[in-house]
Amino acid sequence: RVVDLTRVLAGPFCTMLLGDMGAEVIKIEDPDHGDDTRDWAPFVEGWSTYYLGVNRNKKSVAIDLKSDEGAALLANLIGSADVLVENFRPGTLERFDRLWNTTQRSNAVLPARNAACSSPVGGAASSKYSSE
């Protein structure tokens, strides 16, 4: 089981491949608007082809990660997961103290992977845009 806290392209593509290989992927989305790519053209019958392309073979659930109830739901999912994939900017998960504590406590052997497009070290990290 894969808990997918990713959005846009790099992370969803990574978890799409895991789903293509048979993993159960549970994508966590914001309850207010879902993944940003749900609104990206082109559309077929009202559905974003971009979103559908990189989010196939996934179950999707809307969870408010900023609420206590959302953190508890995430903790339950992580507790039953084999892998956690997220692609927040470096340090974002840690800023959500409740989520960071949840990911650290729930499953001690859970491999967590950041599928970021930019590196937290090197040229990208030292650019003037690295904190944006």
Regions found by a protein language model. Name each.
Residues 1-131:
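N-terminal helix-loop segment corresponding to the beta1-alpha1 unit
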